[in-house]
């Protein structure tokens, strides 16, 4: 039997994390993972709900079942990811969707990725179980402007637009899924505009502003995690950066607090000199 390169472990301080199960060499591929869910970004103009590429009023072809606009590739209407909103439109709304504005961010698309998560509850319990184990930070989000916006534009919208039974689909459950998407979603720059994907093991990689791994994506949207320039010993934690490593500490901390709801205490953030780089230093122009 081939020993797995990585494993998921748990720690009282950091929760679940990914560790090396063997010694990993520098630049070694440690993980290639298919997404649990993929869908459009929350703020986006109309996109094809199959390939997730931008579409216009002239290029759009309406799905014959549900009316959601797709691109001209006939395979996109049968795409596995499109099935969620297509089924909900046909079976619950019982009326085709009509999208008329193709020039601005469209509110109907804010809920698509959340729908694709909720759809798993009754249609793929295994994926639903994995999704609901992911962190949502609902306690930290509750009461904030983004949380209340999600209540109005996603939770209330879904209940009204798709005629959902609140007993079957509680508002708090929908808002929890919104949090799971926000906290665990990876921006995938393979399309214009980029889309969002949620991965199982990939969501458990911890953050560091001096990460020992990098992430990229394969052409088909699989997450690829590769070690950085240094080897990782067996048992060592694998980390990626959730923010832009080319930002200074203040900007990184603000971004992480706003989007991931934690205060980073990695070696770089804990050192006023940013490990001797003085990356956030202000250069005096006076001699």
Located regions from the model:
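Catalytic cores of histone-lysine modification enzymes
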Residues: 97-223, 227, 258-259, 265-268
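C-terminal SET catalytic tail plus cysteine-rich post-SET Zn-binding segment of SAM-dependent SET-domain
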Residues: 3-5, 19, 29, 40-114, ...
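Residue-level signal for pocket-adjacent positions within structured domains
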Residues: 3, 13, 81, 194, ...
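Catalytic cores of large soluble enzymes that bind and process phosphate-bearing ligands
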Residues: 12, 78, 146
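Glycine-centered flexibility motif
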Residues: 15-17, 29, 144
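A eukaryotic "domain-start" boundary segment
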Residues: 1-17
